């Protein structure tokens, strides 16, 4: 009986979490990150403000509540995308192209995510986000290590991640971000980067 009550309680928590995610995504998309309030989000999700704060400390934390689950799944797909035998630049591009296509599906929310993740170090969702980001960087480092570059693979992986992050922000800032254009530009940048490692 206790196990049944526990599973019912767990399902209720997951349902509440999902209502909060959906409400925050809708209000951020419709009104913008700055205009949407925690109170509006709680009302839309049919939860009390205290319940909302159990899931996210502030609006920034809510952005990551919206994205962390999808970002984790997208990162799984991205890290499996490179094919053995591809040049390093193409392997890296295979990883990042998955993220471009995913973010292109929801550019308004993607802009908020990319704006808010700078210096995101505290909050209920922060550790999850940092874990996902580290998995991505570790995956990049693994590709760099296999390519046997002269420089320290960890340093090169960080450099690659910085190029990707800046390129992604540049692309998503356009009025209608087309993933094909963003990926094509990133390909050129990655080829330049890899050529500099020889």
Residue ranges and their predicted role:
Residues 109, 151-173, 181-193:
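Hydrophobic alpha-helical segments that form the core
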Residues 1-15, 22:
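N-terminal intrinsically disordered/low-complexity leader segments
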């Amino acid at each position: 009986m206790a196990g049944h009550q526990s599973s019912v309680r767990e399902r209720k928590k997951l349902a509440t979490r999902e209502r909060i995610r959906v409400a925050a995504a809708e209000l951020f998309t419709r009104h913008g990150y700055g205009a949407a309030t925690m109170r509006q989000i709680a009302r839309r999700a049919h939860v009390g403000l205290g319940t909302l704060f159990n899931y996210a400390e502030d609006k920034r934390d809510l952005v990551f509540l919206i994205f962390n689950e999808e970002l984790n799944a997208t990162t799984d797909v991205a890290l499996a995308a490179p094919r053995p035998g591809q040049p390093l630049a193409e392997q890296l591009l295979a990883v990042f192209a998955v993220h471009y296509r995913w973010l292109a599906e929801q550019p308004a929310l993607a802009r908020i995510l990319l704006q808010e993740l700078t210096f995101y170090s505290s909050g209920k969702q922060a550790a999850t986000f940092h874990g996902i980001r580290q998995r991505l960087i570790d995956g990049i480092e693994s590709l760099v290590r296999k390519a046997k570059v002269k420089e320290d693979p960890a340093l090169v992986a960080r450099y690659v991640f910085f190029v990707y992050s800046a390129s992604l922000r540049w692309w998503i800032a356009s009025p209608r971000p087309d993933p094909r254009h963003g990926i094509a530009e990133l390909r050129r940048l990655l080829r330049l980067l890899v050529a500099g490692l020889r």
